[in-house]
């Protein structure tokens, strides 16, 4: 690309040598070095004893571990399918993150979660989709209700969707000019072949043809699918199951 003649060189400053004292040590360091430390023994997870497996309504499996350290909880709804099964789920989850409902803006919903000291999100991975709710355990019921109402009542915005599509198209075009991205694509092609890549990736035409209703239907339909629940928090297993039976929305018959 040539040499820029406008670049001005700056003289390097003189570096003052630092006298080291590697042969000396403080009393504090000497005490630490002289202390005998017991070797740390490895600890392995035993799923039979470290986790409890229970059931809630609709025969949904609940993986439970009590948090005895603090008053925080993490709750996951895990669906055994993802963008490998339906690549549009990735776009749907990104779109959902930018929307409000017919009665609340996105900022108002975020403020409600903030006031509850809780967070909520939907992550669409290749093999699984995770709905995550976490935060202060005393507000779990309110946070779950807010999250599930948000999922069912989310309202589309065509302007937001158009910008999301434009960003996705730009990212695709930028990736074509990125050597590392091309190497990764070639690696995926070598591992899985062209048909697998086509099945996992929306074409430009498919991406641009997606509608707001199609994408949000995927979010709303999660309550219709089989899934399992993972919980880590201070609530007892019995109280957790009772709470989930009362507040977790599911269809009468899961797909």
Question: What are the functions of these language-model segments?
Answer:
Residues 207-210, 214:
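Acidic/polar surface patches and capping/hinge elements
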Residues 1, 63, 69-97, 101-153, ...:
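M16 family metallopeptidases and their MPP-like homologs
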Residues 148-158, 246-254:
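A common structural junction motif
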Residues 1-80, 87, 216-217, 225-255:
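Proteolytic maturation boundary segments
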Residues 22-26, 31-34, 158, 177-181, ...:
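Low-complexity, intrinsically disordered regions enriched in charged/polar residues
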């Amino acid at each position: 690309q040539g040499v820029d003649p406008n670049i001005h060189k700056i003289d390097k400053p003189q570096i003052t040598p630092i006298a080291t004292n590697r042969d000396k040590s403080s009393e504090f360091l000497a005490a630490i070095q002289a202390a005998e430390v017991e070797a740390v023994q490895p600890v392995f997870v035993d799923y039979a004893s470290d986790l409890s497996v229970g059931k809630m309504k609709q025969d949904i499996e609940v993986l439970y571990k009590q948090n005895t350290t603090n008053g925080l909880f993490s709750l996951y709804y895990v669906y055994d399918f993802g963008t490998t099964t339906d690549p549009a789920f990735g776009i749907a989850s990104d779109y959902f993150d930018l929307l409000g409902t017919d009665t609340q803006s996105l900022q108002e919903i975020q403020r409600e979660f903030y006031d509850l000291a809780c967070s909520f999100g939907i992550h669409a991975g290749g093999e699984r989709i995770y709905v995550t709710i976490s935060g202060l355990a005393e507000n779990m019921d309110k946070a779950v209700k807010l999250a599930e109402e948000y999922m069912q009542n989310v309202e589309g915005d065509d302007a937001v969707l158009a910008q999301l599509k434009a960003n996705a198209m730009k990212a695709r075009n930028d990736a074509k000019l990125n050597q590392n991205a091309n190497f990764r694509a070639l690696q995926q092609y070598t591992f899985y072949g062209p048909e697998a890549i086509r099945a996992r990736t929306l074409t430009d035409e498919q991406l641009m043809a997606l509608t707001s209703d199609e994408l949000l239907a995927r979010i709303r339909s999660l309550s219709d699918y089989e899934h399992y629940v993972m919980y880590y928090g201070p609530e007892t297993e019995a109280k957790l199951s009772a709470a989930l039976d009362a507040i977790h929305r599911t269809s009468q018959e899961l797909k």
